[in-house]
Amino acid sequence: MVDPSKPPTKKEIDRINRIQRDHFNRLYHLFDPPLPAGVPGRLEKIVAAAAIETGDTVLDVGTGTGILIPIIRHYEPGCIYACDLSEEMLRRLKENYSGVKTIQKDVRELALPDESIDVVFINACYPNIADKAGALKNISRMLKPDGRMIISHPLGKAFIESLRQGAPYPLDDFPLKSETKKLLGPYGFAVKKFVDQPELYILAAVKRR
């Protein structure tokens, strides 16, 4: 796992983000349904881990074409923000789901108000985040006390390992259970749930009061 306290330079972060934006702008159509067998059920487990309550404000980081959005909506949140680097991903999301507030921006640069978010999902994109320290710091700022953050992947850690060699941008590992306290503690998070199965990864954390 890359040490989040030692992020790349701003120039390198911008370069990585530009490569990812262009990559997903070209390939956004590959993320359209139908999803692989078993994935819908695992996505439901990921969203359930956040314990969304009616009226909650939810932020979906690296939302892509919005695969979590219909599941999140089952819980009747008050507002959904969807953040992604790729304008084509967000365009497809807006075609499929009305009423979602889309933001094309790196999560570390999101300017939502302090303590305004109840739940943050980082699904299938944590390894892609170039500046994890900046991302976690900003997410902590935006989350309310007792707000929940879910880092997840519906295909598990091995899927990321299979992508790493061919990816045109760096892909980090998902944190091991033994690494979570060191990773998240400095940003005020306590881990509440950890699942590391061959085809499912869930790290659920709560922002301490």
Identify the residue ranges that each predicted region occupies:
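A conserved beta-strand element that flanks and buttresses the S-adenosyl-L-methionine
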Residues: 121
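A short glycine-rich, Lys/Arg-flanked "PGG" loop and its adjoining helix->strand segment in the class I
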Residues: 133-145
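Core SAM-dependent methyltransferase catalytic element
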Residues: 187-188, 195-209
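Short alpha-helix
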Residues: 172-187
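Class I SAM-dependent methyltransferase SAM/SAH-binding core
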Residues: 59, 65-109
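Conserved class I S-adenosyl-L-methionine
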Residues: 1-51, 67-71, 89-92, 150-174, ...
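Short catalytic micro-motifs in class I SAM-dependent methyltransferases
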Residues: 124-125
